[in-house]
Amino acid sequence: MNNNIMNLIAAIVLSLSIIFGWQYFVVKPEHKKQQQQIAMQKAENLKKQKLKALIKPASDLVVQEANQVQRIKIESESLTGSISLKGLRFDDLILKKYKQDLSKNSTEVRLFSPANTENAYFAEIGLVSNLSSVKLPNNDTIWNSDGEILSPEKPVNLFWVNEDGVKFLVTITLDENYLFTVEQTIVNNSDKELPVQSYGLINRKYIAVEKAVNILHQGPIGCINENLKEYSYDDIKDKKSEKFVASKVDWIGMTDKYWLSSLIPDKSSNYSSNFNYALTQGVERYQVDFISPVQIIKSGENFSITSRIFAGAKKVDLLDKYEKQYGIKLFDRAIDFGWFYIITKPVFYAMNFFYGYVGNFGISILIVTVIIKLLMFTLANKSYCSMKKMKNLQPEIDRIKNLYGDDKARLNQEIMALYKKEKVNPVAGCLPILVQIPVFFSIYKVLYVTIEMRQAPFYGWIKDLSAPDPTTIFNLFGFLPFSPPSFLMIGAWPILMAITMFLQQRMSPEPADPVQAQVMKFMPLIFLVMFSSFPVGLLIYWSWNNILSIIQQYYINKFN
């Protein structure tokens, strides 16, 4: 097949794939999300009128409960909040290192909120029994504590004794990041056998969840039987429940774009686990939970079991650390690196490595792009030489077409013989494009899903590499005092990317086919419009990649 035609097909397929992929996976879900939010808001307004007496802001409820029920204060460099001693519930948690947005008055990110608040989201670890006669701590139990503050330096010990003299002890420790360790001990001082089961749950109110787009997973997630399980909220709503019986549960939880809450049960046995949906009093709730097999504690014996709760930011190195330290399989997959995981995670590691030296992820992107370009130089050189040879062979190919145009078999045979004689690979020109596709999407994933890139600045007006360029040419990049609509937000970096793409085309061999040449001239304009809503970090990569390609082609032209 003619090399120019193949390049045209590859370029068009790549462009259309990105355009329609973006429309289908991002723009369309976002539009649907907006329509759903409008409808939900109307229903929510009616619902709030009915539930207004029941629902209070999280901060108000915490203050109210603090006056009625004692709470253990959580305080570390990473977290602040409290644990309710009524029912031993983790329901008040704020991430101190992260703000909601870049505004001066932005509040810190709240992860957990009490059960009857608007954004209810909480975790529990406790005990149940298959015998109703066994008196165990429950949601109404008021625990006694030996301390008022939980910190990395100060664990807390809780205790409660039932009417039969059975003693229940809980020790809670917190590391310097986001991991709580909960050790439960039962001292059976009664004269009866005590059947108990350990459980853990995470419960969340649906309206508090940001609607997910198809480019990443948000919702129930876990590693069960060494396989990653991911369910959208709609999946669980349709099924009502997804159950796993007597399974190896490494972890289960709920994930957002940047935040994760997960339960990590003791590894001493298998567990039954559930992903549930319930509609109660007009409020939609989702829950993930696990429960252990029945453990019989004989009279005079003790039993202990340890579980963990992770509640915080999905930092790559932190999840890797916990995965290695506690043997939590696939814990890093809570970050949705996508289909190109095998490429995406090394790309992140490379960016993070250079960030440690230069202190700016934008500069780190530039360095990684240079390395990728050097690794692909030989391939690009061969591709460029092949394209040039194909252009030089075009007159001979046209002559063969005129001779054997009616005999397709002979035509293909003669053209292939010409390629073999001149040592030309007709598909070589497509290889750099094919290789760049996974690299492109890997960098996009890194920018879009990793907490490290969230609100990471570059220079000048770029304050967040994971967000689109905030400027637009239609108000002269902010010099005119008005804000154009979103579809006119074509900023400086998209324009720079289009200019460098145009210059790169001028440096490349011009296609012999005039139709193809005309189509290729419009590609920078197409990419300009399409890329304007992409994360600016991706535009920095693409612009810099184009500049390096121009330098590379100049070098090849000069020495080849």
UniProtKB/Swiss-Prot annotation:
GO terms for cellular component: plasma membrane. It is a multi-pass membrane protein. The chain crosses the membrane at residues 7-27, 334-354, 357-377, 431-451, 476-496, 522-542. One of its GO terms (biological process) is protein transport. Pfam families: 60KD_IMP (PF02096), YidC_periplas (PF14849). One of its GO terms (molecular function) is membrane insertase activity. InterPro entries: Membr_insert_YidC, Membr_insert_YidC_N, YidC/ALB3/OXA1/COX18, YidC/Oxa/ALB_C, YidC_ALB_C, YidC_periplasmic_sf. It is found in: Cell inner membrane. Gene3D superfamilies: 2.70.98.90. The keyword Membrane applies. It comes from the Bacteria. Keywords: Cell inner membrane, Cell membrane, Chaperone, Membrane, Protein transport, Transmembrane, Transmembrane helix, Transport. This is Membrane protein insertase YidC. It comes from Rickettsia canadensis (strain McKiel). The gene is yidC.
